[in-house]
Amino acid sequence: MCGIIGIVSLRESKKLAEMTVSALKRLEYRGYDSVGVASISSNGLEIRKAKGKVEEVVLQKKIEEMEGYVFLGHTRWATHGPPTDYNAHPHTDCNGNIAVVHNGTIKNYKELREELESLGHKFKSETDTEVIPHLIEEFMKRGMDPFQAFKSAIKSLEGSYAVLAVINGERRIFFAKKDNPLIIGLGEGQNFIASDIPAFLPYTKRILVIRDDELGFITPETVYLEDKDGNVINIKERIRSVDWDIETASKEGYPHFMIKEIHESPRAVKETIDSLMSDIDLVEKVIEEIKNAERVIVIGAGTSYHAGLYFSIELNRLGINSLPVIASEYYNVRSKKGDLVFAISQSGETIDVLQGIRMMRNSGAKIISLTNVIESAIARESDYKIYMRAGPEIGVAATKTFTTQLASILFILSVLKKENLKKMEKAPDIVRDTISQVEGLTKKIGEELAKKSNIYYLGRGLSLPLAMEGALKIKEIAYVHAEAYPAGESKHGPISLVEKGFPVVIINDGELTELLQNNLMEMKARGARIYAVSVNKKMKDADVEIELQSEIPVLSIAPVIQLIAYYAAVTKGYDPDKPRNLAKTVTVE
């Protein structure tokens, strides 16, 4: 997820450059790979940008020496096109009179780009964003005034966006929002607009939150806002003040990044699905490789292994020979030509996964990767690269990245099975509705489990990987010893530890309810306290049950197990964002 800042002032000065740089530094927590700034002064529009960290780019490009009365700043998290100087934002039109920064995914950018190129427009980057300044330019050529041209450009876009645009000679910043955050900060003689409140918090605490499908512009002293039907919105009743410090603001009011990122999962899933829809040709090539492979080896570590296990089970059920591999055990696998390796890694840098795919490539296997970081090491060494669109994840324990891994896998499976993709379009709402429904009960369960020393998580079939992930999560951040087992294996040893009050969490995706019910009764007979997470089919005699209805059970279960672990951790007074002894990316074997 990119960081965006815009400032428009009555006065032209270098101070705005310093303020822009300061704002970009406060947005660094989002994660990024490149930085860029645009300014408008009496000398015209100027762009300075490069790949690298804020401090590096500021020094290299002498950004703090820029002058102007309008500034745009952007930190880019690469999605379309690798992290390079030319792919960094802001992007401009053919004549360098219009500059745009953008966060989100433009689903129809390929069609728009082809149309604009046929009209003579020249592109300089590989990004989806660059179509926006060219669209504005094209509409202005047709006689529209700047705001009308901006509105027409926005109407041409399909997908998600937070867009800021400036035009040389204009003392205003145009903006539009859909599915990505934009907030206006109201100052004295200057106004701000940003993706996050921390960007402008030192300068004003008066804010106006832009809602989906709203657009408008800010000047140094005014805000103009319209809804999607062109109705002018009275902003006075929506202005409010915040009493936050910088750290609190970066969490957008949430007490921890982990809970914030769980709540970001619906948007992350939407952007992931939208991206896969727009790149359906890639998905179909991946499907052909899967169909033609003698064996599909699915490799991942930790949470990514659990997502991979889910995928492997589904492939085997479809008659496609698949082997799930824990990445750190890659050396046990004897791969050969004809094998296809599906590598899953949030960071794209996990050393065990990287070493595994290198070994298997050397034996003739093809590599497909699913990562959250464009042009990461694993992606670079893959024949086909699929990217999640979760955005940066600050919390060490994977939450929204696990959910987007599952969403990506489910999308691939839907295409493989030739299912109607309309169901996948519902995925963001399914995740959102689940979170809204279960937050209270997951808190209660988390508070109870926080008092326990040992927990079993049981599942069968496709719910087993979710049970494994649930046990890992509560182990990682609440420091409660938890073990996951196939429920049918519980009587082959684990049940010997069950006594009165022993907590057992049963994950039931609705597929094998009767068998799970038998396992529940076996545990119950020995005094276990049963917590059930059930989708579409209720279990009998559970002590506490979360009941869900869902077209995509796995996407409903994922946030439930994350929330339970989160509330267990905070009940014990632990920081769930920074669990002891763990790192976000493991780069040593």
Swiss-Prot record:
Residues 286-426, 445-579 form the SIS domain. Coiled coil: none annotated. PROSITE patterns: GATASE_TYPE_2, SIS. It is found in: Cytoplasm. InterPro entries: GATase_2_dom, GFAT, GFAT_N, GlmS/AgaS_SIS, GlmS/FrlB_SIS, Ntn_hydrolases_N, SIS_dom, SIS_dom_sf. Residues 2-221 form the Glutamine amidotransferase type-2 domain. Keywords: Aminotransferase, Cytoplasm, Glutamine amidotransferase, Repeat, Transferase. Catalyzes the first step in hexosamine metabolism, converting fructose-6P into glucosamine-6P using glutamine as a nitrogen source. This is Glutamine--fructose-6-phosphate aminotransferase [isomerizing]. It comes from Sulfurisphaera tokodaii (strain DSM 16993 / JCM 10545 / NBRC 100140 / 7) (Sulfolobus tokodaii).
